[in-house]
């Protein structure tokens, strides 16, 4: 410790040490005004422990030599202290600053990676443990639920078996055999009854015992002791419910409902019976249309018009058919129709050939003759005035076609006077003429022609319409003209009427003395005039060179348009 003491003394006291002692440790360099102080640290004074670095700063172990120079010659700015140079041992152990930073960085990165890996592993292990616990919890809950469901199912099955046993036992006991056995046991063997009941009970609950004796069922029941088995109380309510349930016949199949389409159709026909009538009535109309289209091959336009207006033609036919049973009420229309049909028969010989082989309508034609004669006797006294007017008007229209207008007017006045004086004689004469001159063969031909022409359609219907219009305009007295002489009876008097017309041409201008003889022949001559005026001879004499078919069409068209009879020429 001598050297440091001396150094301290020299520093504190300012004394100069000797050269011998400080030559080794000190070096002074003085260059004019510059002073350089170099201090060396002895190797013995180097502290190896890093923890004593702080204490070494207070208690310096090195030797620092300072030389006080003259304050005048040296300033503070000129003093330079050299850096402390490390010893040789320090030079060997020292490392550059750049290399230390890179290594530290590498070490830090390695340490960070290890820390992160450890932390991530910890988190992964923690998550795995959590998931493992969750899976175990789920399995536990699911197992508990499954066992609970199995126990409930087992209890339900046991209850069903018990219910079936009770139902079967009750059914057996209430059956005829069971009642008889109970009665016999109750009367004769009382202890046997108790024994039988015990046997029945053991048999009824045998299935339950087998079911509960199963190992799996026992495990389920043991694992869930809180589950209570199903218990049935044998009360009155349960017995009533069992009876109702048995009475419902649940074992029978449910009846299938009928199809809704059949019900709807039945309701429709029940609510609307008119639909059924309409469906049955439609084919009848088609049947009526078929023969009407095949009658006249020459009149194509007329058949087309009939098809366009079927309702009108049907109404006309129905009215004509409805009039026939009552000839005394609507005789004028029927008479005119029959007259025109007879004329058409005479004019068309082809139609006669087609009508003659038909024998079926003849029977139907003969029937109205008796009814006509009977109706004449009933209505003669009531409608004499109407008969007189119609007898006057019928020959008037037919005579206009062949005679001038002046002669017609004079004839009207004479005929009216004659008929007013002797009406009863005229009716008697007509009845006698009808009975004498009746020829059934010709009547059948004419009536068959009338039937055929009635089906033909428009010609007969148009003629009837025009003639009815003419008689309605002339008066209401035309309804019962000569009720005892129908038109198909008058058409047979053509030969006799010709002779009467030839003989009655001159006596028209005679006095009243000859009126009585003419009066008796008026109805026959008038009725015959209808036919003879349109006979083939008169048609030939009065023809103007036109064909018969064209004249018929012109006659029909003129009567339909004007409603009055016009002079028409007939030709064969």
Curated annotation (Swiss-Prot):
Compositional bias (Basic and acidic residues) at which positions?
428-455
TM regions (residue ranges): none
**This protein's UniProt keywords:** Calmodulin-binding, Cytoplasm, Cytoskeleton, Nucleus, Repeat
UniProt GO cellular component terms: cytoskeleton; nuclear envelope; plant-type vacuole
Q: Composition bias, kind Polar residues: at what positions? A: 82-92, 291-305, 400-419, 459-493, 502-514, 522-560
Q: In which compartments does the protein localize?
A: Nucleus envelope; Cytoplasm, Cytoskeleton
Q: What are the start and end residues of every segment in region (Disordered)?
A: 75-96, 282-332, 399-572
Q: Sorted alphabetically, which PROSITE patterns does this protein's record hold?
A: IQ
Please name the Pfam families in this protein's record. DUF4005, IQ
What residue spans carry the region label Calmodulin-binding? 159-178
An example of a GO molecular function for this protein is:
calmodulin binding
Q: Which family does it belong to?
A: Belongs to the IQD family.
Can you state the subunit structure given in the record?
A: Binds to multiple calmodulin (CaM) in the presence of Ca(2+) and CaM-like proteins.
Output this protein's name: Protein IQ-DOMAIN 30
Native organism: Arabidopsis thaliana (Mouse-ear cress)
């Amino acid at each position: 410790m001598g050297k440091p003491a001396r150094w301290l003394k020299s520093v504190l006291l300012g004394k100069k040490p000797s050269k011998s002692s400080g030559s080794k440790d000190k070096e002074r360099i003085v260059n004019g005004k510059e002073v350089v102080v170099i201090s060396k640290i002895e190797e013995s004074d180097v502290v190896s422990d890093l923890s004593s670095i702080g204490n070494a700063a207070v208690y310096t172990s090195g030797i620092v030599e300072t030389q006080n120079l003259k304050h005048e010659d040296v300033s503070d700015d000129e003093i330079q202290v050299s850096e402390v140079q490390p010893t040789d041992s320090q030079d060997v152990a020292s490392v550059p600053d750049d290399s230390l930073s890179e290594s530290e960085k590498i070490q830090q990165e390695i340490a960070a990676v290890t820390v992160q890996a450890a932390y991530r592993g910890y988190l992964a292990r923690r998550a795995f443990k959590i998931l493992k616990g969750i899976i175990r919890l789920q399995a536990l809950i699911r197992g508990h639920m499954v066992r609970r469901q199995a126990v409930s199912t087992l209890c339900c099955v046991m209850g069903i078996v018990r219910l079936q046993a009770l139902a079967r036992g009750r059914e057996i006991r209430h059956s005829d055999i069971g009642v008889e056995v109970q009665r016999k046991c109750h009367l004769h063997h009382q202890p046997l009854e108790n024994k039988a009941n015990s046997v029945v009970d053991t048999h009824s609950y045998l299935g339950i015992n087998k079911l509960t004796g199963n190992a799996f069922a026992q495990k389920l029941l043991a694992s869930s002791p809180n589950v209570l088995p199903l218990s049935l109380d044998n009360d009155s309510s349960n017995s009533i419910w069992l009876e109702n349930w048995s009475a419902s016949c649940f074992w029978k199949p449910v009846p299938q409902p009928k199809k809704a389409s059949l019900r709807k159709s039945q309701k429709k026909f029940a609510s609307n019976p008119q639909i059924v009538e309409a469906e049955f009535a439609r084919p009848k109309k088609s049947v009526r249309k078929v023969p009407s289209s095949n009658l006249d091959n020459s009149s194509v336009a007329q058949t087309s018009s009939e098809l366009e207006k079927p309702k009108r033609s049907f109404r006309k036919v129905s009215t004509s058919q409805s009039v026939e049973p009552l000839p005394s009420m609507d005789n004028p229309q029927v008479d005119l129709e029959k007259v025109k049909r007879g004329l058409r028969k005479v004019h068309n010989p082809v139609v006669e050939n087609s009508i003659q082989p038909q024998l079926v309508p003849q029977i139907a034609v003969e029937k109205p003759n008796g009814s006509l004669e009977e109706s004449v006797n009933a209505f003669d006294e009531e409608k004499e005035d109407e008969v007189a007017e119609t007898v006057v008007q019928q020959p008037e229209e037919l005579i206009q076609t062949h005679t001038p207008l002046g002669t017609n007017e004079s004839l009207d006045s004479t005929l009216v006077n004659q008929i007013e004086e002797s009406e009863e004689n005229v009716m008697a004469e007509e009845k006698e003429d009808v009975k004498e001159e009746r020829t059934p063969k010709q009547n059948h031909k004419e009536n068959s022609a009338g039937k055929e022409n009635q089906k033909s359609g428009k010609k007969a219907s148009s003629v009837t319409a025009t003639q009815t219009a003419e008689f309605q305009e002339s008066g209401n007295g035309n309804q019962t003209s000569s009720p005892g002489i129908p038109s198909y009876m008058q058409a047979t008097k053509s030969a006799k009427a010709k002779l009467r017309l030839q003989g009655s041409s001159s006596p028209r201008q005679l006095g009243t003395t000859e009126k009585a003889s003419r009066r008796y022949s008026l109805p026959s001559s008038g009725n015959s005039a209808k036919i003879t005026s349109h006979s083939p001879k008169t048609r030939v004499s009065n023809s103007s060179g036109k064909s018969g078919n064209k004249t018929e069409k012109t006659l029909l068209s003129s009567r339909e348009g004007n409603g009055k009879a016009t002079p028409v020429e007939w030709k064969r």
